Regions:
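Secretory-pathway/luminal and periplasmic proteins that interact with or process carbohydrate-rich
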Residues: 57-63, 81-83, 151-162
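Short, intrinsically disordered, charge-balanced linker/junction segments flanking boundaries
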Residues: 43, 50, 192-198
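A structural signal for short, hydrophobic/glycine-enriched beta-strand patches
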Residues: 30, 42-43, 58, 71-98, ...
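Membrane-proximal, proline-rich intrinsically disordered regions
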Residues: 4, 20-70
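Sec-dependent bacterial lipoprotein signal peptides
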Residues: 1-18
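Short coil/linker segments at helix-helix boundaries
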Residues: 135, 158-192, 196
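Conserved, well-structured interaction surfaces
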Residues: 86-159, 189-191
């Protein structure tokens, strides 16, 4: 009798588990919008454009892009500006005492802006924005292209050799012209390739 109950329980468990679909695995996040659904109309494109510019401006702390850091990268390191007091935002750049914690700020923040610009460019190329005039869409598209070029130019000036050092043959930074997947690891392009893209 015990064998019959065990067999019935086992068969019932197998049947109940096999009848479940996998749709419960395909839930959309409750606290965000999937990137492919984020830009579907003109207002979404305007919001994405604002987010792109917000990434450039930053929040005026020591890790911001144009809110603070980008000015320091060139001017402080070239002795055009001096940090007179220890602890000032520019002192670490002036002394060139970078730590492992500085790398994400100098690399990730600009590439985050490129990601935002690429998402906007992709949505417009895929004709997701249809409720605006061609001129309105073209303006946003052009702004995203300019921002992407500006950020690539900034990055190659920080991480690449000057173009005149070897006619652009040395390694620069990865040129990213489409949204990347989470595990993509793009290789570095030459300085000349970055300048050509810009």
């Amino acid at each position: 009798m015990k064998k019959i109950y065990k067999s019935i329980t086992l068969v019932a468990a197998i049947l109940s588990l096999s009848s479940c679909g996998n749709d419960w695995l395909d839930r959309k996040p409750a606290d965000g919008i999937p990137s492919e659904d984020a830009i579907t109309n003109y207002n979404d494109a305007l919001t994405a454009r604002t987010g792109m510019y917000d990434g450039i401006q930053g929040n005026s702390n020591a890790t911001s892009y144009y809110g603070a850091r980008m000015f320091y990268y060139g001017d402080v390191r070239a002795d055009d500006m001096q940090a007179r007091t220890q602890g000032m935002r520019s002192s670490s750049c002036y002394e060139m005492l970078y730590t492992v914690d500085d790398a994400p700020n100098m690399w990730n923040i600009p590439y985050n802006v490129i990601r935002r610009a690429n998402r906007l460019i992709e949505a417009i190329n895929e004709k997701k924005v249809t409720d605006a005039t061609e001129a309105q869409i073209g303006k946003i598209y052009s702004e995203a292209l300019v921002v992407r070029a500006l950020v690539h130019f900034d990055l190659v000036r920080i991480y690449g050799m000057p173009y005149t050092a070897d006619n652009g043959a040395s390694l620069g930074v990865p040129v990213i012209v489409k949204p990347l997947e989470r595990n993509d690891l793009p290789s570095r392009n030459t300085v000349a390739e970055v300048y050509t893209q810009v």
